[in-house]
């Protein structure tokens, strides 16, 4: 099998790869547009002279204030990810998305009331509420997409979540360049970027009213008829089609196995997480993936991009904003390639390994240049020398390695590697761990740059090297594996051969199942499907 082949667990009718699955993923991914925009715009907005003048920036401890404004958002997101578990369990994925959008909308609206007379209090409070909203969304959105996605393109569809993140990021990075170029320094100049947060939240509120509920959640809650009806609509197939019969059978078998082993109640997954070593082990793996993701330095760059580029030698407000905007565009373009091709063809594991290796080399080079040339000491307006241009090149090359690997892939893996009855709790833990590591990195990044200088780049480069060892020995490939077979996948050893072993077994079982169906007369297997098998 080619390393770039699209992996199907069984012959899949073309109707399954239809516009409906992409539409549902796109609507749900307005969640990530909120996250991407918020993470991108805040650092550059804080660097606008109009914002600093209105809040008398020079009289404040700017490192502390910047860190607080950024990190309160992550603190809210940590708790939002946990609060989303009962919402997703009892009310469903669709209403969970609605909840996240409403809370974010409220927080974004609160920030618009801030000004020099009122101080930063409304921004602090709004950041916490917005964080709760995006934390809840970061839990529910990947689950929703993975539960309705066909296995062969599940990575691509969950990747739409990441694409939304990058689209929001591009707008967030460029909007401050736009207002800085076109508007005089004023309250209006810096409040516009805050107001734009309302747009993706409003679109998600409208979209959540129109999309279908997750069929797997409907099965989990005992609403079998509605689950079959919804699944048939999403797959664009009649309920008695052989592909549908197989999928319904797999869902119900998985739920029955989990009912026997764990139970289906609200508290059962908590008990399973602490008593079932397999689940606890995968929770550990999911949390560690987000440690390594944040350990790459991405959020230090996202939230404090003007300072990052200044450390390389990029000076001048507009120049820094422009360089930051280009960084956002590079990420978005590469994410599009990752989404359309790499995640489901090259695979999750291979992307993580290659991205960590290449990204680490780039950060060592950038840090080495800063250590030798000390560009942060250059006078304002100094042109980049050849070394500085090379450092910028390797920074963008780091972006090219990081974006299609560690940026979205941990979200894909966490959304798919747990059984249905613990998936909501597991994703809550995974999302919360992401925001915890995100908080720790973003809270102390300003102090790290002040005290460590070039050492910050060496620190992140070293963590990327360690992530290679972690992935190689502990993370199996998951592309094309049905959600109901993930426990079997993680049981197989060695890890680097687990995927090929499982796919071979699944195809053998599928052939036997279809042969039995044909012999019993319960389902027709067309010649086309037999030949594909």
Swiss-Prot record:
Membrane topology summary: Multi-pass membrane protein
Membrane-spanning intervals of the chain: 22-42, 68-88, 95-115, 128-148, 157-177, 192-212, 283-303, 325-346, 350-370, 386-406, 432-452, 455-475
Keyword Metal-binding found: no
PROSITE patterns membership: MFS, SUGAR_TRANSPORT_1, SUGAR_TRANSPORT_2
Pfam entry (one): Sugar_tr
Post-translational modification: Ubiquitinated. Deubiquitinated by creB, probably to control its activity or amount.
Keyword Transmembrane: yes
GO molecular function, one term: carbohydrate:proton symporter activity
Database matches in Gene3D superfamilies: MFS general substrate transporter like domains
Annotated family: Belongs to the major facilitator superfamily. Sugar transporter (TC 2.A.1.1) family.
General function of this protein: Integral membrane transporter that imports quinic acid to be catabolized as a carbon source.
Record's protein name: Quinate permease
Gene: qutD
